Amino acid sequence: MGNLKSVGQEPGPPCGLGLGLGLGLCGKQGPASPAPEPSQAPVPPSPTRPAPDHSPPLTRPPDGPKFPRVKNWEVGSITYDTLSAQAQQDGPCTPRRCLGSLVFPRKLQSRPTQGPSPTEQLLGQARDFINQYYNSIKRSGSQAHEQRLQEVEAEVVATGTYQLRESELVFGAKQAWRNAPRCVGRIQWGKLQVFDARDCRTAQEMFTYICNHIKYATNRGNLRSAITVFPQRYAGRGDFRIWNSQLVRYAGYRQQDGSVRGDPANVEITELCIQHGWTPGNGRFDVLPLLLQAPDEPPELFTLPPELVLEVPLEHPTLEWFAALGLRWYALPAVSNMLLEIGGLEFPAAPFSGWYMSSEIGMRDLCDPHRYNILEDVAVCMDLDTRTTSSLWKDKAAVEINVAVLYSYQLAKVTIVDHHAATASFMKHLENEQKARGGCPADWAWIVPPISGSLTPVFHQEMVNYFLSPAFRYQPDPWKGSAAKGTGITRKKTFKEVANAVKISASLMGTVMAKRVKATILYGSETGRAQSYAQQLGRLFRKAFDPRVLCMDEYDVVSLEHEALVLVVTSTFGNGDPPENGESFAAALMEMSGPYNSSPRPEQHKSYKIRFNSVSCSDPLVSSWRRKRKESSNTDSAGALGTLRFCVFGLGSRAYPHFCAFARAVDTRLEELGGERLLQLGQGDELCGQEEAFRGWAQAAFQAACETFCVGEDAKAAARDIFSPKRSWKRQRYRLSTQAESLQLLPRLTHVHRRKMFQATILSVENLQSSKSTRATILVRLDTGSQEGLQYQPGDHIGVCPPNRPGLVEALLSRVEDPPPSTEPVAVEQLEKGSPGGPPPGWVRDPRLPPCTLRQALTYFLDITSPPSPRLLRLLSTLAEESSEQQELEALSQDPRRYEEWKWFRCPTLLEVLEQFPSVALPAPLILTQLPLLQPRYYSVSSAPSAHPGEIHLTVAVLAYRTQDGLGPLHYGVCSTWMSQLKAGDPVPCFIRGAPSFRLPPDPNLPCILVGPGTGIAPFRGFWQDRLHDIEIKGLQPAPMTLVFGCRCSQLDHLYRDEVLDAQQRGVFGQVLTAFSRDPGSPKTYVQDLLRTELAAEVHRVLCLEQGHMFVCGDVTMATSVLQTVQRILATEGSMELDEAGDVIGVLRDQQRYHEDIFGLTLRTQEVTSRIRTQSFSLQERQLRGAVPWSFDPPTQETPGS
């Protein structure tokens, strides 16, 4: 990461490669040769290796102010540093003196001021920072930007200071590292983990935060960059300060002869620790305790728990005697005495850490004469001639010491980077910054490492040194001068007191970390199941984190850059698309750019559909950046989401060709953008074991997050606890409260479904099938009253909110053990335990349902017909009085295969489950809190507003079937049965959901092929009505369309036959073909058969030669078979491979010329679904045994035929 210098005690103590933050953070301690003046440096000898041909071109800035001209003498490239014009502070140099080689220029030290900062000065700095922040999130000039500026200005005027929001603090800390001119490792600036400790009040709390920081950053040797920010400086109050220059340092003991045992750089802080009660050792590598100071209090001494401090014994790969020298060094370089400045606010305690560059240890810490000074000892052991410098004994010994450091750290699996890799990464960082910001502040004297100077590329690079804000700044030691207020020596603490402090800190570590590690849980849901899972995940993560659960459409994607942990639970809608409330999130995620896909090659700008919904599933870009990611290291750019840890769970059905496609897309994009995946993608198949899959994934995700953030020592127990039925719902934690008069139905439906509802009324309901048919398909005509919210275009969907059947509701009410009065509106209240710093314990209303009677809830808001989930069965098992029923319910809830077979065979409603298990009690609060919501039913609109203004038509198949192989009870479709019984004037709650990807092309001259068997013809009725309007009212002559329809029998269910023939005669259709699957005396034919046998040439011509469109509407099985057929047609007619044809369809989808409107499983798909379920069971059982990871990409997508 960057090279860090520790500062504050004497010039020169090197700090490891920590964050490489601050002004003195690199591999140089004393001054190197001053950097040549830009554009005036002497020409070095010609390079021995040819200049790379990828050097950036010379680009002159626009006319105006003169900018520094910066040359790379190795390759000859020239750039102009325009960013330097934004420098916030003059450097230490004067017109007559260059002070660039001073380690601590007084002018650059931040000192406490007497009294508050001048208001105008602070306001100027605050405005500049707020502007930087909103520019970074691409919201500059927005209403939120202007409002935030006003808030800050008002706060500064009223109080003399202001508070940063957490996202602003994260941005500011990262920018401070990015702006640090002496840091060589800044390419990783975006990966800095920021811990907000601004709520800290005491030195004891400081120590707890610091212990957590060390534990997180050390990460068992896989070091992670981090910063912990303590409260800011306030006028008239002392500061929070860490007296140690680094969190981990070795003591230096002054001997009687004047020599030092240990690290000479730390003699002063060692003596201060002894004065404050520390009992010293006498070793060369004794870890110092910490001296921590709260405002206006004397410093307190804290000993670091030994298990927190990771150390590396040093040995050499070939010099066996090297290990006998007894050398060691600590893993974590953590600078702790620099000041963080953000927007004029100063944070005097903000320890930050990263990892070492090997030369910091091997050259500076071990070889400097004023440090451990082992150079000559090693040279003697190597039998080198130390009598003359011409033998280069110092250089030879230094190289071997550096080899030993690298070898030892790598052997111990502790993060470290060599100086060649670090400086090469800095050159890449310079290039990145030149493109992004027009320059990069850099101090040549500190960037060039203390070994191999001209062998590194930075030696030949001119640099411009200037100072931007936010920044890390030097500050005086707290025990010196004006900073020493309140630093009096306190009495020595006894060993018992010190030990107790460590014990208390250890017990608080997890609590404090949990309080500050925030987790964002995002869900995208069509039916509410993903939302339910997200809420369960929130309850689980509350055991060790500070979680919030948000719908995707409530979340600003730019916030991802400032998140530490994000969990995503999302469904996939239709043909692999995002759910409606995830569409904006998906679009914003696709627009973001990442470290591995930032080049402007066209294939890297593929849309969501072509990248994640293509038929061939081939995406060379994914394999390309994954390869780069595997090859990446700590010297590569971190990407926009460098600090993000994430995991994703997808809900879907393997009956669909793009199973969990949106979840895979989110998982892929988050990794592409630089995020770190904590757990492989989890996938839950609604056809089998979805809840079990989620439960296993959630527990694994929780454990992985706890390990990553060093919290939740009892993670496994907490996960088991949250999913225990006895823990997840307790009778005594819920109660019903009487409410005032409840709202009308439409506002309540709006509350439940989070979208505005409208009321249409029935004009007519007409059966479209023959009276001889045993089935029914109805044409429903609705009067919209010309409401603006019910305006639509042909191809859009209408969502209808049906009630449950009254008989079913009454039967269920009779089973409730404690029903409230039937006419009394009630609400559920839950007893919340409360939490430290949060609201106190008390009864809190459950916001899921509005106030309503129990009958209204069961009628309009709760799903009582879907089979109960395993989780609900587990709850019911705890309420069963008969032990046999309790055992059976528990077995069903725990055995995924048994549950799925039971659900598939019986498809039981809640009432049927209660009839099967009659001893189960049914409390009213359980019904109101645990039953899923009754979801809207979606239908394609079957009309055109131009033909029927103020009306919406629906084509609905009325569903009725018997379970248990035809021998069970008769089940009815909730919405279709209800609508079939409606009369003229009856109200219908509904809303419009646009389908912009399923609309006729704006150019009516483009040819179109429409494929829709059964009720799949519904949207096409709106298409032909719209085209008839174009022909007869507008006088247009659009290209005739081709319709491919399918039904069972020409005499029973040939829907809209007369309308279609009329439209054909009037020029809407050029061809109309019908496939009959059960027509007496005719072979069984499906729509895909007609495409293959009758329309192959036309399909190829329309799609590949004439820029035409193809529309497919129907159930998933039919749509998949049509897709396969079209793919084979394109391969055959276009003389291409099948995979190439798949890629062509992917392009057609991306261009919105291949359109699909797919609805769910139908009874016709039972055979196909059974086969998919069997395969899914096998996969899930392997997963539960650990044979496959929690995330799996299916080897092939199932594409069942019809």
Swiss-Prot record:
L-arginine binds at Q246, W355, Y356, E360. Zn(2+) binds at C93, C98. Expressed constitutively by vascular endothelium. Detected in alveolar and serosal epithelial cells as well as in endothelial cells in one day old rat. In adult lung, detected in rare endothelial cells. Residues 489-509 are annotated as: Calmodulin-binding. A lipid is attached at G2 (N-myristoyl glycine). Its EC number is 1.14.13.39. Its cofactor is heme b; FAD; FMN; (6R)-L-erythro-5,6,7,8-tetrahydrobiopterin. One of its GO terms (biological process) is response to erythropoietin. Residues 755-1001 form the FAD-binding FR-type domain. This is Nitric oxide synthase 3. It comes from Rattus norvegicus (Rat).
